[in-house]
Amino acid sequence: MIFKHLTLFSLVSVMLLGCTCNTNLSEITVACDEAGSQIDLMVDGNLFTSFRYTTDYEKPFLYPIYSPDGQMITRGFPIDPRPGERTDHPHHIGMWFNHGNVNGLDFWNNSSAIQDKTNYGHIVVTKILEAKGGKRAHLKVLSEWRDQAEVVLLEETTDYYITATLDSRTIDRVSTLKAIQDVIITDNKEGLIAVRVDKAFEKPSNETQVFTDEHGNTTVVEVQDSSGANGMYYGSSGKTGDDIWGTRNDWVMLSAEKDGNVISFGFFDHPSNVGYPFHSHARGYGLFACNNLGAKVFNPVEEEILVTLAKGESLTLKHRFYLETGSKVPAERADSIFTAFSGKY
């Protein structure tokens, strides 16, 4: 197994995680609907999120995602479109994990909007290995990354560890990608862990934006009514707003007010990950992504990321998603969340 552009990290100390003033863990219940290819995660009887793995879509994902006070933080389109929200990028669904170039196949941009899927891959869940509730719920999922002939490139084993308090939610995602054949993952901006957010978390904008993927396909993000949009990105680099795109961070958070309450959430990298610290691929129109498998594509002076896995070799990637209601999580506390996560797994 060959990694280019690796950063070593020596963990000197691990701080205790003081996420909220209420640290008592809530009970999480798990409801499995095998026929509907869906697993619901309930906190004190209220839906937090659902793991959806129907083959109607090109990948599994978590959708919807609710804050502890019951506000939806994910965009509804393309599953449940809501009035006034954007309808661009139909491959942005809930929270997901994939990449734009694996053996030349694009897993990121694949959706029902793509007619010729020759150069695209898809992810299929083959087995739910565990679905357990409790104070620390656990989902263990086996998936396959396939080409259009259903030939398997990667076998993915993913552990989701979910905890909740009165005013916070945490998802730790540990994913091991095992090469079923020789695999090359190349430097690409389209990745890696992402969530498409509700309108409240977008940046207000009065400009039409045009984005082009590596296939030359363009997506126009039209100007829309920005009323209610007040999202602000911030990260460990000190960058905020649009300036955070393409920068390296230990963590990136997004905060906004929705229906009178402040909600903050974000992604945390792990020092053991290839490409640590990850690059922010966060856009003001509502894509919130962080990418360990892109470097030069974000910053031309950086060395290109190249991950080569011989058949049977594997790559493990670890990320935390943290969500809190009631305040904008300050940078100092985000640092402590990152440090605590760094000492796990």
Region roles according to the model:
Residues 54-57, 61-64, 165-214, 222-223:
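Acidic (Asp/Glu-rich), glycine- and aromatic
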Residues 189-275:
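Active-site/ligand-binding surface loops and adjacent short beta/alpha elements
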Residues 17-18:
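C-terminal motif of bacterial Sec signal peptides marking the signal peptidase cleavage site
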Residues 89-167:
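Extended, loop-rich substrate-binding clefts of extracytoplasmic carbohydrate-active enzymes
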Residues 1-7:
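Bacterial N-terminal signal peptides that target proteins for export
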Residues 265-345:
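Beta-strand-rich recognition/accessory modules
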Residues 143-147, 160-164, 177-181, 197-201, ...:
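Beta-strand elements of well-folded, non-transmembrane domains
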Residues 23-90, 188, 326-328, 334-335:
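Beta-strand-rich N-terminal accessory domains
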